[in-house]
Amino acid sequence: MKIIFTKVLFDNYVWIMFNSSKDCIIIDPGESNSVIKKIKKLNLNPKIILLTHNHLDHIQGVKNLLYKYPEISIYGPLETQFCGTKNLIDNRNTIEILNTKFYIIPTPGHTNGHTAYYCPPFLFCGDSIFSGGCGRVKNGMMIKMYNSLRTISKLPNDTLIYCSHEYTRSNLEFFKKIFPKNLNILNYYNNIKKSKTQCTLPSTLKIEKKINPFLQLNNTNLRHQVKIHNDLSFSLNFFIYLRKIKDKS
């Protein structure tokens, strides 16, 4: 399987996975025109759409793709049913599409039904985790997002992180100010800032465990750099604190 992307809207990535027969899977089409253009250019045959959650910047290309390719099958959580999902994955552990197995990983927090698709070593994770950060959390779902990130962190270190937004530079620019002594964050930020390549993805889980504070919640050195009075002795409290200060930025 090969994976390519097309950039849509402002900073969204639509990932396209295809096999030797040029049958392809489209992940989170937030817009359709760029996707169709890419498909035609490479002579791909769209067979499947995978949706991670129901936000418009991930689904608003579905309608036109379905009109253009009426035989396409759509997979997603229940919350995406309104946009044409016929193959619901909420109660499934795996799906097999294009002779390839995908593990279904519930990752609630950004939305209640948010789901990631894991086809080792590829993780299509939507807005759950970003390079250097994580998705905004829906009201009342801090614990769910915390647990979702813990689930992702248990995957193999060689897991390739295919998230849906190009936020790496802005995430690290923020966190290098919060954790100025963290050389992993600073060095990685400087490297991507110098790079002529705009796309910083995919990342790897191994890299994220070094540069992403949301995957270092048990790191006492990071906690000690945060000079506040809140009780940060527990990793959940540290996560909530980091997410709240990031939301204010």
UniProtKB/Swiss-Prot annotation:
Keyword field contains Methyltransferase: no
SUPFAM superfamilies documented for this protein: Metallo-hydrolase/oxidoreductase
Obligatory cofactor(s): Zn(2+)
GO BP term, example: methylglyoxal catabolic process to D-lactate via S-lactoyl-glutathione
Pathway annotation from the record: Secondary metabolite metabolism; methylglyoxal degradation; (R)-lactate from methylglyoxal: step 2/2
Family annotation (InterPro entries): Clx_II_MBL, Glyoxalase_II_hydrolase, HAGH_C, Hydroxyacylglutathione_Hdrlase, Metallo-B-lactamas, RibonucZ/Hydroxyglut_hydro
Binding sites annotated in the UniProt record for Zn(2+) 1: H53, H55, H110, D127
Domain of life, source organism: Bacteria
Residue positions binding Zn(2+) 2: D57, H58, D127, H165
Keywords linked to the UniProt accession: Hydrolase, Metal-binding, Zinc
CDD domains: hydroxyacylglutathione_hydrolase_MBL-fold
UniProt enzyme class: hydrolase
SMART domains linked to this entry: Lactamase_B
Catalytic activity field: an S-(2-hydroxyacyl)glutathione + H2O = a 2-hydroxy carboxylate + glutathione + H(+)
Cofactor note: Binds 2 Zn(2+) ions per subunit.
Gene Ontology terms for molecular function: hydroxyacylglutathione hydrolase activity; metal ion binding
EC number: 3.1.2.6
Role, per record: Thiolesterase that catalyzes the hydrolysis of S-D-lactoyl-glutathione to form glutathione and D-lactic acid.
Similarity-based family: Belongs to the metallo-beta-lactamase superfamily. Glyoxalase II family.
HAMAP family: Glyoxalase_2
Known partners and oligomeric status: Monomer.
PANTHER family for this protein: HYDROXYACYLGLUTATHIONE HYDROLASE, HYDROXYACYLGLUTATHIONE HYDROLASE GLOB
The protein's name: Hydroxyacylglutathione hydrolase
